[in-house]
Design a protein with these regions (language model features):
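RNA pseudouridine synthases
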Residues: 1-177
Length: 177
């Protein structure tokens, strides 16, 4: 979807949202190229929402600074709500509705990963199981805080890592038959 104020795109798995030292093939760079190709006067990319590289989903871009400020304000005041869906797998029982409240900190052994740790920052995740396929569950997730890798860390912490998330204990071999 696109109008004069914002652009909404479906980010595929495997593409980073924003450029970094190791990622130049990003959705933000794609948007910049799109703006140039369209001949837009304002070609500055204002990314409002981001997703991890190995996550697919909807991203929101503001097309000018005023729209970006307004959308940021709406996100802060929770008048725009973000929802996440994930497939998780575990051998125990996953409560049909639950909350995970566990502090998250940087993993001192890695520059990438995070972990649940006493000295970490407060993190709160709510979820509801939408459908189950044996030991695999589709969950509807709402974040009450926005810590790096929060969904991945929290579900791994309770023994239900995200399917395909080998960084936090999910197997790349698993799938739904």
């Amino acid at each position: 979807f696109e109008d004069d104020h914002f652009l909404v795109l479906n980010k595929p798995f495997g593409i980073a949202s924003i450029p970094s030292a190791i990622h130049s093939n990003t959705l933000a760079n794609f948007v910049k190229g799109y703006y140039v190709k369209q001949g837009y006067e304002n070609q500055q990319v204002h990314i409002v929402t981001r997703l991890d590289k190995d996550t697919s989903g909807v991203l929101l871009f503001a097309k000018h600074g005023y729209a970006h400020a307004r959308l940021d304000k709406q996100l802060q005041s929770k008048t725009i709500q973000k929802r996440y869906y994930a497939l998780v797998k575990g051998s125990g029982k996953l409560d049909p509705v639950g909350e995970i409240i566990a502090p998250i900190a940087r993993d001192e052994d890695s520059i990438i990963t995070r972990k649940v740790a006493k000295g970490g920052k407060y993190a709160h995740t709510s979820y509801q199981v939408v459908q189950s396929f044996g030991d695999i569950h589709l969950v509807d997730i709402q974040l009450h805080t926005g810590r790096t890798h929060q969904i991945r860390v929290h579900f791994s912490h309770i023994g239900f890592p995200l399917l395909g998330d080998d960084l936090y204990g999910g197997s790349l071999e698993d799938g739904i038959e």
